[in-house]
A protein has these predicted regions:
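Short, aromatic/basic-rich helix-turn unit that serves as a nucleic-acid recognition element
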Residues: 36-67, 94-97
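Catalytic-site neighborhood detector that most strongly recognizes the C-terminal catalytic loop/helix
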Residues: 53, 57, 195, 224, ...
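N-terminal DNA-binding recognition helix of tyrosine site-specific recombinases/integrases
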Residues: 80-127, 172-174
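Active-site/catalytic core of tyrosine-dependent DNA strand-transfer enzymes
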Residues: 218-261, 273
Length: 329
């Protein structure tokens, strides 16, 4: 009977498909078991490899540094042997050498790698990270900026443009490095790229890390003139092709020869810009946009500072307000 033959064929096909499914499930279990046999270090390597195309070069470099230096008591442990006690012990050892932020970053990397290759193990890991320490930032005063500007202008011309771009425009060193003449037009600086070092230390051009990184920053006609000085080709680098590392080195050399000035990191010029915007009364959402942040969280968490002199003025105002109530009663 044709119907019977057809039914037998369907049954045979069903059995065959069932065998294939069982075999695939078995292979999946084998694969999961193999994943459990890799070490934490191997899991991190494979995690980086799987994400390499979408991670920024600086992030990859940071991951490689973590793998090489932090949580070393974990690196040769198989995922199948990993438990909360071992994990916490490795964290405790690192507390003597690294900041809470560094440890938190390392834990985040290990968690992500373990979750990718052994999610059931990750769900059983419970550790306590060291408490965050409130970070204090040095913010130079306007008087400091004026003094530094005048000295750089006369003695370190190579540093002049990076200094102005950071202190007056709020650019990151990597963005300064990528800036070319065609990024400046009609009173605007267009931020479209950054130059960073890859994990091998080679400078590469990349798109901004987030969509918010693409932005326009207003500049005065005089500033535009200064930035475009000695630029013969609009494709030419504004700062002579200096990398962020070279800018930092030049900045340190400047302070080495100006020992009467209080040293602060080049990145503090960006803090100065943010604080200046806050003191001018610019809304936080606009400051975030100018600085390339996707939200105001960073402004509130990091840049919500005022100049020490301005803070002193506010303290005096508060003290005077106390006198008012005492004098009227």
């Amino acid at each position: 009977c044709a119907c019977l033959v057809g039914s037998e064929m369907c049954i045979r096909d069903s059995i065959s498909n069932y065998d294939i499914i069982i075999k695939l499930i078995g292979n999946g279990e084998d694969l999961m078991n193999n994943n459990k046999n890799i070490t934490v270090k191997q899991a991190i390597d494979r995690y980086i490899e799987s994400k390499y195309a979408v991670l920024s070069p600086s992030t990859v470099k940071g991951y490689m540094i973590v793998k090489r230096n932090q949580l070393q008591n974990l690196m040769e442990v198989k995922l199948s042997d990993l438990n909360s006690e071992l994990y916490q012990s490795a964290i405790n050892s690192d507390m003597l050498k690294y900041s809470p932020k560094s440890i938190s970053n390392a834990v985040g990397l290990v968690n992500a790698a373990v979750k990718m290759f052994a999610p059931e193990i990750r769900s059983k890991l419970y550790v306590t990270k060291p408490q965050k320490i409130k970070t204090s930032f040095y913010i130079p005063e306007k008087e400091d900026i004026d003094i530094i500007y005048n000295r750089i202008k006369h003695s370190n011309p190579n540093l002049l443009k990076p200094f102005l771009l950071a202190s007056q425009c709020g650019l990151r060193p990597s963005e300064i490095s990528a800036l070319s003449g065609d990024c400046i037009c009609k009173g605007q600086i267009e931020i479209k790229a950054a130059i960073v070092l890859d994990h091998q230390g080679h400078p590469i051009r990349k798109a901004p890390k987030t969509y918010a990184g693409y932005r326009s920053i207003p500049i005065s006609p005089q500033m535009e003139k200064v930035l475009l000085k000695n630029i013969n080709n609009r494709k030419e680098s504004i700062c002579g092709g200096m990398t962020a590392k070279e800018i930092g080195n030049e900045w340190r050399k400047f302070f080495d020869t100006n020992t009467d000035l209080y040293y602060f990191k080049f990145y503090a010029l960006r803090h100065y810009y943010a604080s200046k915007c806050l003191l001018m009364g610019i809304p936080q959402r606009y400051i975030a946009e100018l600085m390339g942040h996707s939200s105001t969280n960073m402004i509130e968490r990091v840049y919500q500072h005022v100049f020490p002199s301005a803070m002193q003025k506010y303290k005096l105002l508060l003290a005077d307000s106390m006198n008012m109530i005492l004098e009227t009663n």
